[in-house]
Every structure is written in C-alpha cells, then in structure tokens.
Amino acid sequence: DDNPALAEVFEEAGMPLVRLFTPGEANKTLPLVKRIVSDIVDIGRRLRQMAATLGPNADEDEEVKRLLVEFQGVLREMEQLGCSYKDYNFDIGLVDFPAVIDGEAVVLCWRSDEPSVMYYHGLYAGFAGRKAIPEALLEPEEIV
C-alpha cells in the first residue's frame, strides 16, 4: 500500500487511498459495511423526504441538522474502513473497495443486494463496466 504512484492514481479518480483490498479482505468487512450502508441509506432517504416536505428552508430545521451530522459520521466510518459509498440516490447501497487486479488500479464493487463482493471495474468505468472478479483471486467459499 506504500506506493505513492498508485495512491495518486486513486486520488485523481476522487478516491483517497486508505488501503487496498483483496476480494477476501473486502468480503471480511461486509458485515460492518452492510450495517454502515443500511444507516447511510436510511438517513439519506429521511433527509430526502424532509427536504421535499420542508422545501428551501430544510437546512434550518433542527432534525435535518442532526441527521446531517449523523450522515457525515456514518460516511466517515465508511471512509475510515478504506472504501467509498457510491449511491447518493439511496436506492440501493453501492460500495467501492480500492484494489489492484492484473497490475491495474481498480475498485471491487458491491451492491447491498449481493451476497458477497464478486465484481470489479476500472476507476472510470463505473457500475456499467462491472466484470466478475477472476476466480483465482477469490477464496474457495466465495466462488458462486
């Protein structure tokens, strides 16, 4: 992880590099990541609903202020783990884990309706560019 050039590649893609993950390591964090994603989606939906109800003055509402602080806290938890939350529509939790596959800086990509981290994509490919993680990189119990 002490590769400054690699850190720069992730930084340029808007993803500060806290650590790199193997598919196995990403999957081991999932119980905690799932809890954090659940909190993010819940708070995000509540904020969106309150903004629609309260209109332009929503940011002055005490409950909105409290929720925003809570929201920033759970996002920070996610960042401290080294991964990034990606679904700000709050439809479904989407999380990227920085990784290197075949010498290329990529992100392992997990959706909250998936049982494990099974896909990855290039830093700029986005969700539409997802590919299956090569089986050789998965733990035997992760191969579906």
Regions found by a protein language model. Give the residues of each.
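Long, hydrophobic N-terminal alpha-helical segment
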Residues: D1-G55
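A generic structural signal for short, solvent-exposed coil/turn residues
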Residues: A13-M15, E77, V100
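A generic "functional-site adjacency" signal
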Residues: R19-L20, Q72, D102
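Hydrophobic stripe of amphipathic alpha-helices that form coiled-coil interfaces
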Residues: M50, L54-N57, L81, Y85
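Intrinsically disordered/linker segments and immediately adjacent domain-edge residues
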Residues: A58-E62
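Short amphipathic alpha-helical coiled-coil/interface segments
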Residues: V64-M78
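Glycine-rich, aromatic-bearing surface loops/beta-hairpins
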Residues: C83-V144
